[in-house]
Amino acid sequence: MSLSACAELSRCFAAAASAKPNSGKSNSTAATSLVISSPIGHDGAVSSVSRSRKTSRIVAEASQGLTYRDAGVDIDAGAELVRRIAKMAPGIGGFGGLYPLGDSYLVAGTDGVGTKLMLAFETGIHDTIGIDLVAMSVNDIVTSGAKPLFFLDYFATGRLDVDVAEKVVKGIVDGCKQSDCVLLGGETAEMPGLYKEGEYDLSGCAVGIVKKDSVINGKNIVAGDVIIGLPSSGVHSNGFSLVRRVLAQSGLSLKDQLPGSNITLAEALMAPTVIYVKQVLDLISKGGVKGIAHITGGGFTDNIPRVFPEGLGALIYDGSWEVPAVFRWLQEAGKIEDSEMRRTFNMGIGMILVVSPEAANRILENKGQADKFYRIGEIISGNGVTFS
């Protein structure tokens, strides 16, 4: 399936029109394709449309500290685009787009891995970037309680390096295995002159399914509910424009050791994004999960409020989880304010679940040795996210 058709699945499922492959793209090699020749549903109604951004709204810049804006990310332009799209596609804002199908919803999400790709080019680490690609979409759709069904990818480059492309696809296959979903198809586009030598771009689309009476939507969240955090592997796939700016300013190279650890900066920054699908679906099956947020672009500040109804806020307990060394280094080397860190990075928590107090006790008491769950906060009356 072409990228345009995949994006339509995620963003405009409601059109109830056939999704068609892009047959007019020059110098394009279709790896595999899927053609949907008729609408998936019957009523053409849209429940939710997803439009995710890798950027977040940033407050006033610190006088000396670096910000996402300093790194070249125009937050205001991104917010303005979302506002304009909202006029054409009411209902945007969820982590995944929902399309009714009988007694279930198809849930779709599409994403890329941002400028983490530039570190892949520099380090030569191409075999895990595909895991990042899958993770960004499947982690989004599982926030609705959806089980991923299939994934499609788009690989674009100026000149096809078969060995590199094979490594990338291997990572995508690994990510799909971790998600219990199928790599159903994709597109490989070779477009001379559009990319620099040795560079490529990636994007992907995941589609899952959830019963209508099992959708996780946050509507039942109340003050006093508990926020459980699932640890990240590091930076994951967001904020790399700022990461690269800090790296350049620090005078260190990717081969240097990460301060405060026994691994290199390359190893820390290229650690693949955690895929939370199996873990989250298992927790959902045991009951008490009311809302889920994937902590991506926008960090804690912008993502957590997407989960609960108006009139409620989140109180996050400072020091309630272990912040990885890579974030401590980024903040110190870039002189980044606390508020900027929280709006840009996951700070060591890649997924949060809002659960009832009873479910929280069960989750924390019965976790296995391999499980790391943190009670990181609670739901309170108010708005936004407060740290204390």
Curated annotation (Swiss-Prot):
Q: Which GO terms describe its molecular function?
A: ATP binding; phosphoribosylamine-glycine ligase activity; phosphoribosylformylglycinamidine cyclo-ligase activity
Q: Which GO terms describe its biological process?
A: 'de novo' IMP biosynthetic process; adenine biosynthetic process
* InterPro entries hit by this protein: PurM-like_C_dom (IPR010918), PurM-like_C_sf (IPR036676), PurM-like_N (IPR016188), PurM-like_N_sf (IPR036921), PurM_cligase (IPR004733)
Q: Where in the cell is it found?
A: Plastid, Chloroplast; Mitochondrion
Keywords assigned: ATP-binding, Chloroplast, Ligase, Mitochondrion, Nucleotide-binding, Plastid, Purine biosynthesis, Transit peptide
The principal location of this protein is plastid
Q: What is its EC number?
A: 6.3.3.1
Q: Which GO terms describe its cellular component?
A: chloroplast; cytosol; mitochondrion
Cite the NCBIfam families for this sequence.
purM
Q: What is the protein name given in its UniProt record?
A: Phosphoribosylformylglycinamidine cyclo-ligase, chloroplastic/mitochondrial
Question: Organism classification, top ranks?
Answer: Eukaryota, Viridiplantae, Streptophyta, Embryophyta, Tracheophyta
Gene that this sequence comes from: PUR5
